[in-house]
Amino acid sequence: MASSLELPKFEPDRDRLVWYLAYGSNLSSQTFREDRQITPQAAVTITVPGWRLTLSSAGFPYREPSFASIVNVGSAGPTDEKHDGPCELPLHGTAYLITWSQWIKIVASEGGGIVYKEALLRGQPIQPQDQQRWGAELSVLTLVSTMERWPEPRPSQRYMGLILDGARAADFPASYIAQIRHKHPCYQPPSTTWERIGATLFLGFWTPVLTLLSLLTHAAARAGPGDDGHVPEGVRALVRFAMFTMWWVHDLIWSRIWGRGDGLFPGAMQLNG
């Protein structure tokens, strides 16, 4: 089983160059360069043996049920969905060459340690010209979700579109793109009047709550995320509590009355983290 490496200690030289592995929405040029406002010095398409893409990071029921994360191949988990098929391709991603200060900015923009933790992995460039320039192996920093749901909820069409557009732009193998599309069908919004009423009521309450928490998170990050990009522990605990509460209400109360907001069948979900 593959495992992550020991994370490097913070260095005062914020212009030091590091590789950052994007595998989800940051594959999209618009998300990474425009929304994150980060221009990398290089971009290399890589594979990461021993790891695979998941859509298991807890999102927002009825709107954005899940976001991307990664897991070890064959890692133990609460369901069989965490185990790979014999022919499944390993994780593909884009390694961006950025400064340490830009890496800290990414950590802060992805919630400042609330949902994701840092990991250091080894990746292999796909293209021969990249192998010749950068070597056969790269050490890459990335983020792994600490709030996962199994089986994996279905991602929104918007979010999956960002991943697929980024994968195509990075010239990922067609077989890998097909694998993503096959394994992760998109969430379909409620189709009946009853389900739409339930979704509207749920979103009407939780959207303002999550909006306020998002503003709090970004304000805490702008106020000074520190050397690691993390928000204060009190903010982290508050947001995680709200997320667990929201999904608890969805799983045990709301979905039994109005229908599920994650695209799965009744009784399917478990939130971990």
Swiss-Prot record:
Keywords: Lyase. It catalyses: an alpha-(gamma-L-glutamyl)-L-amino acid = 5-oxo-L-proline + an L-alpha-amino acid. GO terms for molecular function: gamma-glutamylcyclotransferase activity. Its EC number is 4.3.2.9. It is an enzyme of class 4 (lyase). The keyword Lyase applies. InterPro entries: G-Glutamylcylcotransferase (IPR017939). Disulfide bonds: none annotated. Pathway: Mycotoxin biosynthesis. Gamma-glutamyl cyclotransferase; part of the gene cluster that mediates the biosynthesis of aspirochlorine (or antibiotic A30641), an unusual halogenated spiro compound with distinctive antifungal properties due to selective inhibition of protein biosynthesis, and which is also active against bacteria, viruses, and murine tumor cells. The non-ribosomal peptide synthetase (NRPS) aclP is responsible the formation of the diketopiperazine (DKP) core from the condensation of 2 phenylalanine residues. Belongs to the class-I pyridoxal-phosphate-dependent aminotransferase family. This is Gamma-glutamyl cyclotransferase aclK.
